């Protein structure tokens, strides 16, 4: 787009039409920007003429390229390697920091050229796409843009509208305008501007002024421009809007400013974009598959669980859902027994003094349900670790007791904003397979190996593969650097001995200790973080936890390992529901066996068979509907995902047998009731993933 004052296009579209003329703030903002840009270009030209000097740019393969500071850009270096590389590069990474391709290099540096496949490049690509959509939203609605970040799959932009709202009927109009913006190849320009100047530029938008006043603690910050849109933004961005090859707007909702229910209501529009239309087709197919697997739909259809407005964010587990919940906990309990964990029960409500000691009151009290009792402040616990510290501390401890592994399925509550609640994945009431290991420094390596083996055992039963990342000391860490180094070395040794591939995530640990991040991959390729293995050097200090060491030192400080495998049981049930698409493996299935009598004369025998399976602790039902044909009963049981369907007729009644088939219509034929019970008990005990095939 030329540097002239923006003028509005006209044209008829579905839904809302672009405004004509555009809101006055767009032109006022552009006028200010042009003056600032001219000053910036003049300063940069002077710097390039005066301060430019030869620099060395080191590529990932170690090769060095000659360049000039304040003149050479990453894009020029990419072109020097190959035009194809330059065209396919989304963003640069200079000295490990993402960097605009057209921003001049300033000193000797390392340079990486990131393509769309890289996660950081995807975030930049989707962030730039959000700006394209933001430009279209300003031109169609004329409201005040708020936040417009990239998210895990795509991007969104929030807008404040004085009146009216956004309708899905507007998507076509917005997409058409986005395509026009893309076709214009509007350049993304970066400008560093004084805070007070930006307060003047954005005086029409109270939300941008709030960001400047409350979040920007430096004298200057950056804005980015594409076409008529100028927005507060750290960047970086793609070179121009033409780099976005295909863009789809697919969802809208309302939300609150910064998620706070007492703040303004905003309109949120979601989009997705890709550098290849084929990727969009794949994404659409994936969305359809994910929609069919949505745990909220399956939970409703299979009568597993539901939510009610009278207790937002707290799930009601129906009998069949409760079976899944309890079976998961029993699975973990059985592993606890093998692995030396001791299960404990701790209070749900604690005096706020506990949370002040732990540090949660200072940093987390907004997310806690708190109330007054006899002029004292209490809160429902959002996590178990402080309670476990009290358990460790309730009597003197000896080195002989270490490692002490305390496990807790206690009910936890977190005061999530109502707008953030999403099925079982974001709740207020939940339970975790939570455990804390109190150990000596030299025991860390063995304990971490045990935790890793534990998670491999559990995830292999579910059929999940997983990714491991070691997150090490951040810049702002607490404690002795030697202790950190020793602990990180032990974590590294544990991971190497574990034998699975892992990656280093330097500087991404918590301030109180390094951690191992674990992501599981589900049946449709999505990654979820559930397990936690986190070292904590600070909580033992806060609670003044000590033990008597073997040399008699009674002030030895333990280390705490926070660990969970399922994480939130509720969230794991959501993931498993979607992973299996409601087709539960036999051991976890809430519908394991359906007994189907051929006709009314076999009903009594069918009832006896059902009772035998019930007594053997199977989830068993019987279909005695006289209005259904045999084939219809079998089909209904298969559609309801009963793992095994036991047909009983006169022949089976006479011989004390059942005729077995599976939900996938594999026929196993006739077996005695006793044999069938015994075999199914074996498969259940083995937690077989393919019990129907293995029968």
UniProtKB/Swiss-Prot annotation:
Domain of life assignment: Eukaryota
The entry's keywords: Acetylation, Aminoacyl-tRNA synthetase, ATP-binding, Cytoplasm, Ligase, Nucleotide-binding, Phosphoprotein, Protein biosynthesis, Ubl conjugation
EC main group: ligase
Catalytic activity: tRNA(Thr) + L-threonine + ATP = L-threonyl-tRNA(Thr) + AMP + diphosphate + H(+)
UniProt region (Disordered), positions on chain: 1-21
Entries under InterPro entries matching the protein: aa-tRNA-synt_IIb, aa-tRNA-synth_II, aa-tRNA-synth_II/BPL/LPL, Anticodon-bd, Anticodon-bd_dom_sf, Beta-grasp_dom_sf, TGS, TGS-like
The protein's Enzyme Commission number: 6.1.1.3
Chain ranges of the TGS domain: 51-115
Location of Phosphotyrosine modifications: 270
Post-translational modification (record): ISGylated.
Positions bearing N6-acetyllysine: 215
Annotated Gene Ontology cellular component terms: cytoplasm; mitochondrion
GO MF, one annotated term: ATP binding
Phosphothreonine, modified sites: 218, 425
SUPFAM superfamilies assigned to the protein according to its UniProt record, in alphabetical order: Class II aaRS ABD-related (SSF52954), Class II aaRS and biotin synthetases (SSF55681), TGS-like (SSF81271), ThrRS/AlaRS common domain (SSF55186)
GO BP annotations listed: threonyl-tRNA aminoacylation
PANTHER family reported in the protein's UniProt record: THREONINE--TRNA LIGASE 1, CYTOPLASMIC (PTHR11451:SF36), THREONINE-TRNA LIGASE (PTHR11451)
Assembly description: Homodimer.
Function: Catalyzes the attachment of threonine to tRNA(Thr) in a two-step reaction: threonine is first activated by ATP to form Thr-AMP and then transferred to the acceptor end of tRNA(Thr). Also edits incorrectly charged tRNA(Thr) via its editing domain, at the post-transfer stage.
NCBIfam families membership: thrS
Protein name, per record: Threonine--tRNA ligase 1, cytoplasmic
Species name: Rattus norvegicus
Lineage of producing organism: Eukaryota, Metazoa, Chordata, Craniata, Vertebrata
């Amino acid at each position: 787009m030329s540097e002239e004052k923006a003028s509005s296009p006209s044209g008829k579209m579905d839904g809302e039409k672009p405004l004509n003329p555009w809101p006055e703030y767009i032109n006022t903002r552009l006028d200010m920007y042009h003056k600032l840009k001219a000053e910036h270009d003049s300063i940069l030209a002077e710097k390039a003429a005066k301060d430019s000097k030869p620099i060395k740019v080191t590529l990932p393969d170690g090769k060095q390229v000659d360049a000039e500071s304040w003149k050479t850009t990453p894009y020029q270096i990419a072109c020097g390697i190959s035009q194809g590389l330059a065209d396919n590069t989304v963003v640069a990474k200079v000295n490990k920091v993402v960097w605009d391709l057209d921003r001049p290099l300033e000193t000797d540096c390392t340079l990486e050229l990131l393509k769309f496949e890289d996660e950081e490049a995807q975030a930049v690509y989707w962030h730039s796409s959000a700006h394209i959509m933001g430009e279209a939203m300003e031109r169609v609605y004329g409201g005040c843009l708020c936040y417009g970040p990239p998210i895990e799959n795509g991007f969104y932009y929030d807008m404040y509208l004085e009146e009216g709202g956004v309708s899905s009927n507007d998507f076509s109009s917005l997409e058409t305008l986005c395509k026009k913006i893309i076709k214009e190849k509007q350049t993304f320009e970066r400008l560093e501007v004084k805070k007070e100047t930006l307060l003047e530029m954005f005086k029409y938008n109270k939300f941008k002024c709030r960001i400047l006043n409350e979040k920007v603690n430096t004298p200057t910050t950056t804005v980015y421009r594409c076409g008529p849109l100028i927005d507060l933004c750290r960047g970086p961005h793609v070179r121009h809007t033409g780099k976005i090859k295909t863009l789809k707007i697919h969802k809208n909702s309302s939300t609150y400013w910064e998620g706070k229910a007492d703040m303004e209501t905003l309109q949120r529009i979601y989009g997705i974009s890709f550098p290849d239309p084929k990727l969009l087709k794949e994404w659409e197919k994936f969305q359809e598959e994910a929609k069919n697997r949505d745990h909220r739909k399956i939970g409703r259809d299979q009568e597993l669980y539901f939510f009610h407005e009278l207790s937002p964010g707290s799930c009601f587990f129906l009998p069949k859902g409760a079976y899944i919940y309890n079976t998961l906990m029993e699975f973990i309990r059985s592993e606890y027994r093998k692995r030396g964990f001791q299960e404990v029960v701790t209070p749900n409500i604690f005096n706020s003094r506990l949370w002040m000691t732990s540090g949660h009151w200072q940093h987390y009290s907004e997310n806690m349900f708190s109330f007054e009792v006899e002029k004292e402040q209490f809160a429902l616990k959002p996590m178990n670790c402080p309670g476990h510290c009290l358990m460790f501390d309730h009597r003197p401890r000896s080195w002989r007791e270490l490692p002490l592994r305390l496990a807790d399925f206690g009910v936890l509550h977190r005061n999530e904003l109502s707008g953030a609640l999403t099925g079982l994945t974001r709740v207020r009431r939940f339970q975790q397979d939570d455990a804390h290991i109190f150990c000596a420094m030299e025991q860390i390596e063995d304990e971490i190996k045990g935790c890793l083996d534990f998670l491999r055992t559990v995830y292999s039963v579910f059929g999940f593969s997983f990714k491991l990342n070691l997150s090490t000391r951040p810049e702002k860490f607490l404690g002795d650097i030697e202790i950190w180094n020793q602990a990180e070395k032990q974590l590294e040794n544990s991971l190497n001995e574990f034998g699975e591939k892992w990656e280093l995530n330097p500087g991404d640990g918590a301030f109180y200790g390094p951690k191992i991040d674990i992501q599981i991959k589900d049946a449709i390729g999505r990654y979820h973080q559930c397990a936690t293995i986190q070292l904590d050097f600070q909580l033992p200090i806060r609670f003044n936890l000590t033990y008597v060491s073997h040399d008699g030192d009674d002030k030895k400080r333990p280390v705490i390992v926070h660990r969970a495998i399922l994480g939130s049981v509720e969230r794991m049930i959501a993931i498993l529901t979607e992973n299996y698409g409601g087709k539960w493996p036999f051991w976890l299935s809430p519908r394991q066996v359906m007994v189907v009598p051929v006709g009314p004369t076999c009903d009594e025998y069918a009832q006896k068979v059902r009772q035998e399976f019930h007594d053997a602790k199977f989830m068993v039902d019987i279909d005695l509907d006289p209005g259904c044909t045999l084939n219809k009963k079998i089909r209904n049981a298969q559609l309801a995902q009963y793992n095994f369907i036991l047909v009983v007729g006169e022949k089976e009644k006479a011989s004390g047998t059942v005729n077995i088939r599976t939900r996938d219509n594999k026929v196993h034929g006739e077996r005695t009731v006793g044999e069938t019970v015994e075999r199914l008990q074996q498969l259940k005990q083995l937690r077989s993933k393919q019990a129907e095939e293995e029968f």
